[in-house]
A protein has these predicted regions:
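Residues that recognize and position ribonucleotide moieties
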Residues: 3, 47, 87
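Enriched for short, Lys/Arg-rich terminal
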Residues: 68-99
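Short polar/acidic secondary-structure junctions
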Residues: 54-56, 67-70
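Short strand-loop junctions, especially beta-strand C-caps/beta-turns
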Residues: 9, 52, 80-83
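A short, surface-exposed loop/turn module that caps and links secondary-structure elements
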Residues: 28-58
Length: 99
């Protein structure tokens, strides 16, 4: 099992949409299968996973951007956005995450 940490940006975004229970359910799934998300091309290893929200329909889901640091079992939850607000992470946002 991996350890999950959230960036401040991720926390602020996720708090707008998720309950504590939804957050824990998602994190448990990602920690048990850190390869669940698709690798984002030219991102240096960031992954994107789509997560549905109960009762919200297809457009009510969210996208999570995370980085899996395999050497030490750490997963960094980096970015969060609602599918109905944004389809993909912008290149400028991804560049900020990469540092």
């Amino acid at each position: 099992m991996y350890t999950i940490v959230e960036t401040e940006t991720f926390k602020k975004q996720a708090d707008k949409f998720w309950t504590t229970e939804e957050r824990l359910e998602c994190f448990t799934q990602i920690a048990s299968d850190p390869f669940i998300g698709d690798v984002i091309l030219k991102s240096g290893g960031f992954r994107k996973v789509r997560w549905s929200r109960a009762g919200m329909g297809k457009r009510g889901g969210v996208h999570l951007i995370y980085f899996n640091v395999l050497e030490d079992g750490l997963i960094v939850m980096s970015y969060f956005y609602a599918k109905n607000e944004q389809e993909n992470i912008l290149a400028s946002e991804l560049q900020k995450l990469k540092g």
